[in-house]
Amino acid sequence: PSLAPHLQAFMGEGGFVGAVVPPPATTLLNAPQYLTGRTLADAAARYIDEKLGGKANVVLLTHDSLEFLAPRFTAMRDVLLAMPGVVIVADISPVTVDKAGGFTTMNTILLANDSIDVVLGADTVVLGALEALRKAGKDRPDQFLGGIDGEPEAIAEIQKGGPYKVTVGLNSAVFGYALGQAGADWLEGKSVPQAIDILPMPISPATLAQYQADLADPAAAYADPSRRGAYLKMYGNICFDTRDRYVNFPWSSESH
């Protein structure tokens, strides 16, 4: 049975509901998927231009079967196909979206293309691809492997300074704090945002220390407008008197 009628009744009585993705909610959080993919692809494009002379053989390890995540890969294609020196040698969804899937898929790709410069996808599959490159002796320090999710193993690879250059993460501590703050503000009778974008953050050697500091102390990050603005974007407002105007549809800032 759906929780929605119970949540709607609770909100009608003045209660606060904070949700990540599914409605209904007083304050709804979501992550813009196209922007998430674009953030990773833009980092790769800069690297290709600055370090690889504008030329690269690229592998996209996708997850297009999950409609929710498909915009990530649309964004990657949009960025990379606009670069004349880039060849997408493989654009494929591993059978399983995990390290084993990435490892198996990359081994297959290497049979036809043994010189790979860039690999993009979810962290778990890209970590598997890195393992395949290493076992085949085809890993190079100047490669750009990049993922999405901010996985600890990906961050450890980035800290080593090898092929893994960036992971795009969502700062869970900061967005969790934001949702808690909205609930606290509501209890004090204040207006709260109707919707919040959880913005993708590229985690690289240059940004890692700040990201980890904000993960450890989300209150300080939230209190600093510029740091908060790097992680969150607020939309609309709702208060007790307008509580019937809650979000009751699958909201995304990228819906047109």
Residue locations for each model-derived region?
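Flexible loop/hinge segments that line or gate small-molecule binding clefts
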Residues: 1-35, 57, 151-160, 164
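Hydrophobic alpha-helical
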Residues: 75-76, 95-157, 180
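Short, solvent-exposed amphipathic alpha-helices that sit
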Residues: 36-43, 67-87, 105, 128-132
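Hinge/cleft segment of the Venus flytrap/periplasmic-binding protein
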Residues: 61, 68, 178-256
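Periplasmic-binding protein-like
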Residues: 1-8, 59-60, 90, 113-123, ...
